[in-house]
Regions:
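A short beta-strand-turn-helix
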Residues: 20-37, 61
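Short active-site neighborhood of thiol/selenol oxidoreductases, capturing the structured segment around
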Residues: 32-51
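Loop/turn elements at helix/coil->beta-strand transitions in domains of secreted/extracellular proteins
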Residues: 34-39, 67-70, 94-97, 124, ...
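Thiol/disulfide oxidoreductase modules built on the thioredoxin-like
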Residues: 105-150
Length: 169
């Protein structure tokens, strides 16, 4: 009987390690709990939509014009590479309110990341705005329009929250 228990324990530990959070995800999870406004941008240097966003200068401008906001640029599906060289071309890496991270996973295959911080990932770029642990906005499946992102950042400075509201169920 003890051999069966040992095998069950090994299987359970193996399953738990498969779902372990990467250092990048751990950093994001810690950051989004902050009371300050936090933007998590998921991207990859090989992604044409991500490059289009960078080439417009929108990210550089939004980072510079919002020094009170923390930006986490997380390269995903890029075999653990953070894309820092690409971001450096656009003057983003030297900004004090920017943290550059990389998920260690590959672009394809069963080890490709499918969620981050509890949210599904199926397309990049994706941009999430948090304040005090609350997801304020999620812009998924394509390029962000920077005037819209700026409006969302402005709106997110308010103190509104859905906590304490009655359930609709």
């Amino acid at each position: 009987m003890s051999l069966v228990r040992l095998l069950i324990l090994i299987v359970l530990l193996s399953a738990a390690s498969l779902r372990a959070e990467s250092p990048a995800e751990q950093a994001v999870l810690a950051a989004i709990k902050s009371p300050q406004l936090t933007v998590v941008h998921l991207w990859a240097p090989w992604c044409s939509n991500c490059l289009a966003e960078l080439k417009t200068g929108g990210w550089t401008k939004i980072v510079n014009e919002n020094p009170q906001v923390k930006f986490y640029l997380v390269s995903i599906w890029n075999d653990g590479q953070d894309g820092r060289a690409m971001l450096n071309k656009f003057g983003i890496t030297a900004q004090p309110n920017v943290t550059i991270l990389a998920d260690p996973g590959p672009r394809r295959g069963e080890n490709k990341i499918k969620q981050l911080a509890g949210l599904p990932l199926s397309w990049i770029p994706a941009t999430w705005i948090y304040k005090g642990g609350d997801l304020r906005y999620a812009l998924n499946y394509g390029e962000v329009r920077f005037p819209v992102l700026q409006q969302f950042l402005t709106d997110s400075q308010s103190e509104w929250s859905h906590k304490g509201e009655p359930s609709i169920e």
